[in-house]
Every structure is written in structure tokens, then in C-alpha cells.
Amino acid sequence: MVSAGNHAIVALGWTTSEDGTLTRPLDLVENWLLARIQRANTPPGREAEGLTYKLKLRLPQDIDDPIPYLRRAWLVFRYVQPLIGAIYPPYSERDETGRYLVTVPPMDPEEWLRLSFHVNQGSQAVFRDVDDAGMIFRPRPTAMAYWFPPSSTLVIRSTHLRFDAVGLYKATNTFMLGLESVFRLGLDANLDCYTTDVKQPSLPPGIDYILGFPPQETPVSHRVGCAVDELMRHWHHGLYSLSLPVREGSEDAAPANTQHMVTLFDEPTLEAIVAGCKELGVSVSAAVHASIVRVWASFPQQQHTGARNMLIPLVANLRPLLDPKWVVPDYALSLCIFVVPFCLTGGFEDLTQRLGAVYSRDLSALPSDSAGDPVSFLELLPLYDSQEAAFLGSLPVAGCPPFRVPNLSSLGVLERYLARAYGQKGAQAPVCEIEDVALVNATTDPTIEFQLFTFRGTMRLYLYYNDAYYTEDFLASVMEMVRESLLQELGLDGSESSEGLDPKEA
């Protein structure tokens, strides 16, 4: 077996046992997400906040059987990114003080591949097809890889505790570089001979250590307290938030399967959208988010009598706050996001402009003190985390409508994080390519999640939902309304919109 500590740089905060197992307590952001998972209404055998990631690959035609190469690349990935094999709660233990731990066992190559890499075909098939892989997320101790030969698709499944979306795409680049290297060097090279973008495998510290959070008992300054109070006011004002009607009789139903649909914007349409947004002085993300809000507000007969506001959960990327030495591929497999609440009040006129103003701000400095000066997340996260957890744990509040506002995660152009092709030299054909990507978030409540990104010149807007609460037909019409709202508000012809919606596309 290969201990992570034998070949990787191990940061402060990790403890090594006699057999080479490494552990550290969950950091503040991991504990924040774990609390959200534990609050979820999840049936036994399923997990909230699970990620199912689909990579449709084009591999060398002269390789008759790509499976050994994919297995080897998955092993290389584990070697250079030890955290892909990390064990998180509920499978990891607690320390003597009761804190949850992240555990990285020594790497046994054969055991790692036996447990975590599966070929989905014949009697060994776990899923019916690629679409089926995203419907039910059953928890596993480590990340899992499933190869679907008919569609040449690699499906990676993991708890969200292991990485966020940006980290996942960064990690994809590492995996693809390793795969190209395996095709180039063959199956028998030593693990440290294969090349990726990871210069030295490492186990980075928890984000608490990097950001220098003070001990829990440290007194909180008045300016930090005011900034946290401002964020919490957004949560409280957003209690009376707009929502979509769920299917009749499903208010108290247990969650069922995660489903998804996607609407595509081809390159000419995307160029027109970008031009329209530039003319308005807003980002594409703000325009899409405004369209979602408009559609939600178009169901007035379904709203609670007090629902006048719209709570917008914004995803803040903490990576810009990290020391530059940690903003590297080695830190891809880490949770570096935080949800910031922003409540839209006072009606929906000039919605795009107001949302655009929020999106144009640095979300890491969105909260402000009593003088209006921004307060960094570095200062307020510890206090805000505890207050947000207490608030969300108090829901539902009597007399308030159900709390199920839509989330939008906007990832921009994925080519910032990964390439379309790998191993291409000059006019030669690339060794391997990513033809398409898709990411499905497991949903276990009536909250609808959107994800927006562009890859290979096509913008995709995904919608994820749990089919215990909504029908496909209803949400297909909602997605069409969002699309039409976006195009019409930007002065674009929406006549082709129905062709862009594909509920079944992976």
C-alpha cells in the first residue's frame, strides 16, 4: 500500500496514524455543508448534496479496449489527488472531542480500483443507462467512477463534501491530462511517471487554517456583528418568498428521484445574448437569473398572501481569498464555496439591472458594516455560519410559506478550467477529447436548482428537480417560459426556443 504521507506534501492540521492513515477535523465550510446535508429530508440509503458528473469522451480509435487505460488513469488521479479517496461523514469517525473527521487511508491500488471503478455493462451493470446514473444518489465512502462503453461516457459520483463545481472541473483537467499520459506512456509506467497539472501531490489544510479563522471563543467586533446581521436580514425577509406550486398532495411527501432537463443556446444565439447583455450593462448570469425570478413571479395565484420578496441564494467562490500558493490544481478537491443570501424587495421592475448590480459586486465583500463599508468573509464566516445554521434549523416558521426558492449556479465558460482536447500537437489529431459534460445535483426537497455554463460554444441551462414534487410536463413549460423571457427581454426572436429544450439530454 502507498501511504499518502509517503509521496504527498501533508499540510499542518493532519494527523498520521501508525498505518499511514491521515485525518483532520472538518473545516468550517465542510461543517456548514454537512449541517445542510443532515437537515435534509433524505430517506435511508440516499444522500443529499450528491454530485453525478458525466464526461462523454472521444478516445483513440486504435485502442481496442480503453478500459485498462481508464482504470490506470483513475489510479493516477487517486495518486496525485489523495483527497479523491478521502472518507467523509457518515463513514468517517469522530475525534475524542466529537468533531467529525476527514480520513485518507493508505492507497492500495488494486483495492482502490476494485471498490471505486466499475464498468457498467452486462451482469455488472449498476445503472440502466447514463440517465439512470443521476436519478438516485446512494452514498459511498469514496468517489466512484462508472464507465458506460456504449456511449463512451465516464460517470463520476461523489458527495459534495469532496469538491464544489469549480473544483470538479479543475479536477477533470487533472484526470484528462493523466488519461492522455497513460495513452502516451502505456499501462506499465510507474505512477510518478505520468504527467498531470499537479506538480506535487498534497493534502492541503482545512480552509480554517488557510484563512486564519480565530478560535471560536474570540470576541466578535461590532462591525462584523453588523455585517452578519445584514446577511441574516436577507434570510428573514426572504421567508415570505415566491415559489412554484408543487404537485397536489406532495407537500409532505418523501423525496423520490432526481430528474433534470436542459435548454441549449447555440453559438449564434449565445452571441446575440451576450451582445444584448452588454447593451444593458449586465452579465449573462444576471439576465438569466432575472428571467427565472420573472417566471416565478408569474404564478401569483399560487403564492402565499405575504409573498412579496424573492430570496436569491448567491454562490460565493472563496478561492480568491486563499493564499496564492493554494490556488492550484492540488486544491481542486476541496470545498471552497459559500451561499450568500440576497433578498429582492419592492417589486420586480428594473429587475435585471438590480440583479446585475449584485452580480457585478465581489460576493466575498457583499455584506457591509453599519457605515456601509464591505466586510470580508475572512472576518464574518465563523459567526455567520453559526447564525445561519440556527436559522435554517428553525424552519419551517409558522405562518410563513414553504421555503423553496430556486438556486442558480453560474459557472461561466468551462474552458477556463478544462480543455476540449488533450495531447494535440500541431495538425495532429488529439489523443482524447471531451465531447460533452453534464453535472447533476441530487435534490431531496421541492427546491429547484439551475446550473448555467458554456462549453464548446453552446450555453446550457440545466434544471434539477425531485419528481416527488413536480411533473416533467409542468417544469418543461416553466423552463420554456424562462428561455422565452430571456430572449424576449433582450429583444431576440424566441421562435426557435422550443427546439432548444431537451428534458432527456444527459
UniProtKB/Swiss-Prot annotation:
Record field: transmembrane: none
GO annotation, biological process: alkaloid metabolic process
Highest taxon of the lineage: Eukaryota
Subcellular location: Nucleus
Induction: Expression is induced in loline alkaloid-producing cultures as well as in planta.
Task of the protein: Transcriptional regulator that may regulate the expression of the loline biosynthesis cluster 1, one of the 2 clusters involved in the biosynthesis of loline alkaloids, potent insecticidal agents composed of a pyrrolizidine ring system and an uncommon ether bridge linking carbons 2 and 7.
Protein's name according to its UniProt entry: Loline biosynthesis cluster 2 transcription factor lolU2
Organism: Epichloe uncinata
Gene name for this UniProt entry: lolU2
